[in-house]
Amino acid sequence: MEFSTKALDWAKAGALAAKSDCLVIGLFESQTLAGAAKALDVATKGLVARLVKLGDFEGKRGTSLLLHEVAGVGAARVLLVGLGKEADFTDRAYAEAVRTALRALASTKAASVTWTLTEHTARDKDTAWAVLTAVTLIREASYRFIERHPELKSKRDKNGTGLRKLVLAVPAADAKTASVAAARGTAIANGMDLTRDLGNLPSNICTPTYLANTARQIAKDFKLKVEVLGRKQIEALKMGAFLAVTKGSVEPPAFIVLRYEGGPAKQAPVVLVGKGITFDTGGISLKPGEGMDEMKYDMCGAASVLGTLRAVAEMGLKQNVIAVVPTCENMPSGIATKPGDVVTSMSGQTIEILNTDAEGRLILCDALTYVERFKPAVVIDVATLTGACIIALGHINTGMYARSDALADALVAAGKQSLDTAWRMPLDEEYQEQLKSNFADMGNIGGRPAGSVTAACFLARFTEKYDWAHLDIAGTAWKSGAAKGATGRPVPLLTRFLMDRG
């Protein structure tokens, strides 16, 4: 899908003459016509005003009206999209308008579109935000896994999007920043697509080795540095917690380090650590069979940090960013780790593994110790860590834990800006009491109360040497039911966070 931006002056004659399959125009409710809507009304000798007067189209949120072969317009179709009341035109209202337009376009054969919704900026937002957000939302809605991996079905699906080329209309004064925003939106969408592909692939394809090869391909495509450690190297590093999770599987584990060096050599890096459990049976603490197929998504943290690195590299951000991915399967077998086993982590702290299904924190804790060597400015781990986070926050907000208020505020702000929201959760010291063990420095679970919080508190014990945040994406990484599939979150949040850092 190709995006471009174009400065259009609606006051000039012929502004609507450009040929395309559809011209998309936004209209506010109970508002004097302006911009593209006014130009259309003038070109059609009052058609828009008559439609409003007759009540056929009032500009209400979530509504649209498709017109064909409108005189004076170069496009084969005109799609009017309701924006609601201008005073209530928030970022979410803007996103709703984009999605409303896409639903209407899906019922047509339109391939080329002139898109003017980008002339309407949401409250407290600018044109660059409108362009970037439109591009990411359009690409998000257009994603079709089977179109990208047709080998997985014997017959091709016929429900793919027909959109191929979109020209985003912007004010002349914003033309330069809008062009940059469109490119950045495309980069973010490409990162999300990679994240979704990795999540959606079955676990017999997306193995730890597959993730490692994906990192190598990203490194090749964007001239990044990559290192993949195998079992012997992991053993040499004394990552006892990580190794405990790997014991039950025949798939070899991997420890991936992917470096993007876009900033000065002396700039401390931002390190993103992604949980890469490519399939999670729960191990000896076996999960119920129903819904276990969705445990292929337990590597979405890893997928998202790889997707973020890809986006950052394509954008060419002036940052140093490192993705670290511990990856393996969690399987039961005769040699698998058992409940009650005690292991020594890379940090030297000992852990009583009370539940082998709380494995994500075990592979992450060693990774969080490993990244100390980078002397990071910030470390953010991303993981489908706890079902308890879904109980607490549902599928709207990612659970976010942070040691410092400044980092927490920056992540919350990035989530709001990207429409990929996170909600800060507590890390009070009192929760650490639940992790006490009679047989080791700590247990790997703290009981049912505050399960997401105690999981984060467990990780906090391994992050005292740097500024750290934890994103629990168990409720936001994928959808179940008819819309089953990976979402690509939190790539938008993470990329916005990095963009905001300069």
Curated annotation (Swiss-Prot):
Gene3D superfamilies: Leucine Aminopeptidase, subunit E, domain 1, Zn peptidases. It is an enzyme of class 3 (hydrolase). It comes from the Bacteria. Keywords: Aminopeptidase, Cytoplasm, Hydrolase, Manganese, Metal-binding, Protease. The active site is at residues 287, 361. Mn(2+) 1 binds at residues 280, 357, 359. It is found in: Cytoplasm. Mn(2+) 2 binds at residues 275, 280, 298, 359. Binds 2 manganese ions per subunit. One of its GO terms (biological process) is proteolysis. CDD domains: Peptidase_M17. It catalyses: Release of an N-terminal amino acid, Xaa-|-Yaa-, in which Xaa is preferably Leu, but may be other amino acids including Pro although not Arg or Lys, and Yaa may be Pro. Amino acid amides and methyl esters are also readily hydrolyzed, but rates on arylamides are exceedingly low; Release of an N-terminal amino acid, preferentially leucine, but not glutamic or aspartic acids. GO terms for molecular function: manganese ion binding; metalloaminopeptidase activity. SUPFAM superfamilies: Macro domain-like (SSF52949), Zn-dependent exopeptidases (SSF53187). Pfam families: Peptidase_M17 (PF00883), Peptidase_M17_N (PF02789). Its cofactor is Mn(2+). InterPro entries: Leucine_aapep/pepB, Macro_dom-like, Peptidase_M17_C, Peptidase_M17_leu_NH2_pept, Peptidase_M17_N. Its EC number is 3.4.11.1, 3.4.11.10. GO terms for cellular component: cytoplasm. Belongs to the peptidase M17 family. Presumably involved in the processing and regular turnover of intracellular proteins. Catalyzes the removal of unsubstituted N-terminal amino acids from various peptides. NCBIfam families: PRK00913.1-2, PRK00913.1-4, PRK00913.2-4. This is Probable cytosol aminopeptidase.
